[in-house]
């Protein structure tokens, strides 16, 4: 904006612009862990980005399940065409989430996947990812804050949460600021 490259009104009239976030820095200065990019092939060597989604990208569970089934049904096809593997996705995601944990969490931080619940269109994916990552799937009501520390309610009592992989749209993240 200051350089005059991007018009101010383009930013300030965007429905995803969050003035409440001005001056805030994310933990570890990590602005996004996952970005879903939809590519379209335009020719032999050409690609165009159709959409990028850094907020709450979804669809990876279907891709992973599809690939597993396709490899089972057509193993020769994958060998002949040197199709790159994708089965390490959840390992890489877990490593990224662990790397974002605060130092006090140690080598095995408590990570949760935060979902809006079973009525969300991407709930299958939230459940799938939590299962593959080996972490808890939680809703907002499962969490509470005490002395600036997030805890998860469990049958064994409160358990500290070190990393939240949120799968809630920005508009519904904080009911004191955004939509309720």
What name fits each language-model region?
Residues 1-180:
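Domain-scale recognition of functional cores that engage charged ligands
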């Amino acid at each position: 904006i200051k350089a005059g490259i991007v018009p101010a009104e383009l930013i300030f009239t965007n429905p995803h612009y969050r003035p409440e976030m001005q001056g805030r820095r994310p933990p570890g200065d990590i602005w996004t862990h996952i970005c879903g990019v939809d590519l379209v092939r335009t020719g032999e060597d050409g690609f165009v980005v159709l959409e990028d989604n850094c907020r709450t990208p979804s669809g990876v569970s279907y891709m992973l399940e599809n690939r597993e089934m396709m490899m089972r049904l057509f193993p020769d096809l994958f060998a002949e065409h040197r199709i790159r593997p994708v089965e390490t996705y959840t390992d890489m995601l877990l490593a990224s989430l662990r790397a974002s944990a605060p130092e006090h969490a140690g080598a095995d931080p408590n990570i949760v996947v935060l979902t809006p619940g079973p009525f969300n269109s991407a709930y299958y994916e939230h459940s799938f990812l939590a299962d593959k990552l080996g972490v808890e799937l939680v809703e907002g009501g499962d969490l509470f804050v005490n002395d600036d520390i997030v805890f998860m309610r469990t049958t064994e009592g409160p358990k500290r949460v070190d990393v939240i992989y949120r799968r809630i749209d920005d508009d519904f993240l904080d009911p004191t600021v955004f939509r309720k």
